[in-house]
Amino acid sequence: MRKKILILGSTGSIGTQALEVIASRQDQFEVVGIAAGGRDPQLIIQQAQMLGLAADHVAVANEKSATQVSRALGAAVLSGRDAATDLVESVPADTVLNGLVGSMGLRATLATIQLGEVLALANKESLVAGGTFVTSQAAPGQIVPVDSEHSAMAQCLRSGASAEVSKLVLTASGGPFRGWSREEMWDVTPEQAAAHPTWSMGQMNTLNSATLINKGLELIEATLLFDIPADRIEVTVHPQSIVHSMVTFCDGATIAQASPPSMLLSISHALAWPHRVPEAQPALDFSQASTWDFMPVDNEAFPAVELAREVALKQGTYPAVYNAANEQAAAAFLRGRIKFPQIVDIVGEVVAGSSQFAGVASSVEEIIAHESESRRRADALVDKLSR
């Protein structure tokens, strides 16, 4: 029997690649619904028609785009800010791939967990924002990571018992400004920040990779997914992006997962978990000479990782504060209001002034309230810096 799949964020980088994977494995998977923000209504229409989806199996957040898609499909699609969550709640599925961008994916993540469906999670921000409020509601193995780094860790962790794990090692490409000083990055433009040396991603994910905020979010996500404290997670720069992550065990052995830099493998693995998909992507060719480099993160130039470690150790809703403040500061940089290094400066300042967020959230509303306050503070700092 084919697995029924919902894809949230179908027009984004993860969503389009997931559709590519599923198109080549129609004997294993069936797409039963899609959700998107609405920036590209024509692509949503094309996807819905190609998949043969009824209008009520399509969700579009942007109301204007939803009207356009509804007209093309001949009936009303689900629309509005909570359209993706409405889709999850109304269309039964075996697996929900959450590839939405930012913390807007939180409600859909929670809805998936509460329905008992498998959550293939690419929307790390929803886990970071929700923290233990999310993980405490999930059954063991219900959340399956899509990020290549966490997928790699999950694969490596199958090599030993949890009590045998000494540390996790996250790899980072280093982004387009690897080796630059803070001073050299002062006049970086949004166009420069959008040029990732290895991966093809959406605008926000690419910018987060340039600041290493993305790696900070991944560190926090790893603590939640694998129940390993942040002081036992190492981050190393690996420019080739071939070793996606490693796990060191108590006997001194380190197990690494290596494959060419592509999301096809980790997406396939998440959809088929706990099984592997044959020939999901080409394997490494060891007959070709190559060099793999590993080096420490320059924490002076890129303080985002150590700030994330601090946030993860504090717990509470600090991770939600970290993420929300970054979303505001990053948007301000893209609009030309602040300088590139000031993105993480603002995040650090908001986190430092948020002692009231130390408690564990007891509701989605509480998380959203803390996020809103963090955004307000970040916006105030942007206003101050851009005068």
UniProtKB/Swiss-Prot annotation:
One of its GO terms (molecular function) is NADPH binding. The lineage of its organism: Bacteria, Bacillati, Actinomycetota, Actinomycetes, Mycobacteriales. GO terms for biological process: isopentenyl diphosphate biosynthetic process, methylerythritol 4-phosphate pathway involved in terpenoid biosynthetic process. Coiled coil: none annotated. It is an enzyme of class 1 (oxidoreductase). Its cofactor is Mg(2+); Mn(2+). Keywords: Isoprene biosynthesis, Manganese, Metal-binding, NADP, Oxidoreductase. Its EC number is 1.1.1.267. Catalyzes the NADPH-dependent rearrangement and reduction of 1-deoxy-D-xylulose-5-phosphate (DXP) to 2-C-methyl-D-erythritol 4-phosphate (MEP). This is 1-deoxy-D-xylulose 5-phosphate reductoisomerase. PANTHER family: 1-DEOXY-D-XYLULOSE 5-PHOSPHATE REDUCTOISOMERASE, 1-DEOXY-D-XYLULOSE 5-PHOSPHATE REDUCTOISOMERASE, CHLOROPLASTIC. Mn(2+) binds at D147, E149, E218. It comes from Corynebacterium diphtheriae (strain ATCC 700971 / NCTC 13129 / Biotype gravis). 1-deoxy-D-xylulose 5-phosphate binds at K124, S148, E149, S173, H196, S209, N214, K215, E218. Belongs to the DXR family. NADPH binds at T11, G12, S13, I14, G37, R39, N123, E125, G202. Pathway: Isoprenoid biosynthesis; isopentenyl diphosphate biosynthesis via DXP pathway; isopentenyl diphosphate from 1-deoxy-D-xylulose 5-phosphate: step 1/6. It catalyses: 2-C-methyl-D-erythritol 4-phosphate + NADP(+) = 1-deoxy-D-xylulose 5-phosphate + NADPH + H(+).
